[in-house]
């Protein structure tokens, strides 16, 4: 499944979840199930973004090492600077991919929290139905 397909599926699942009334236990349970599916997709997006981030980091390090080792001219500091300049594009990509990974991680954690809130709400409903508080 491509990223665009995953995002479309996420949007569809969020719409389904939003259409359910949390005041009815059956719909609340259905919403929990949908949030579980959302969590699974978010985990995949987080993993894919983390992979892109780490691959960009590896490419940046490889570029620096290659330039440093293949250019014997200049001082050590000059060679390091040349390596960093050659790897500047990879450093930018690394930052973009890191931001994307953190975005998906935040969405994942927020969804976990939402699931916990819904579970507490369901438990409260059960207690009220039994005559408790």
Task: Label every model-predicted segment.
Residues 30-65:
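Short, well-structured hydrophobic secondary-structure segments
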Residues 10-17, 28, 64, 77, ...:
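Generic structural signal of hydrophobic/aromatic residues within well-ordered alpha-helices
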Residues 62, 92-125:
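Long amphipathic alpha-helical coiled-coil segments
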Residues 11-42:
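Short, charge-rich amphipathic alpha-helices with coiled-coil/heptad character
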Residues 1, 127-133:
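Short acidic DE-rich linear segments
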Residues 1-5, 9:
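Extended assembly-interface/linker segments at domain junctions
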Residues 54-96:
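Extended, amphipathic alpha-helical coiled-coil scaffold segments used for oligomerization/tethering
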């Amino acid at each position: 499944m491509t990223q665009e397909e995953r995002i479309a599926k996420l949007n569809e699942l969020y719409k389904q979840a939003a259409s359910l009334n949390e005041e009815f236990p059956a719909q609340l349970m259905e919403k929990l199930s949908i949030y579980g599916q959302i969590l699974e997709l978010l985990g995949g997006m987080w993993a894919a973004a983390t992979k892109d981030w780490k691959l960009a980091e590896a490419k940046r390090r490889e570029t620096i090492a290659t330039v440093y080792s293949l250019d014997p001219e200049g001082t050590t500091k000059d060679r390091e600077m040349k390596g960093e300049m050659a790897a500047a594009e990879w450093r930018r990509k690394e930052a973009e991919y890191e931001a994307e990974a953190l975005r998906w991680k935040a969405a994942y954690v927020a969804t976990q929290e939402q699931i916990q809130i819904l579970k507490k709400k369901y438990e409260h409903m059960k207690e009220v139905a039994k005559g408790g508080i």
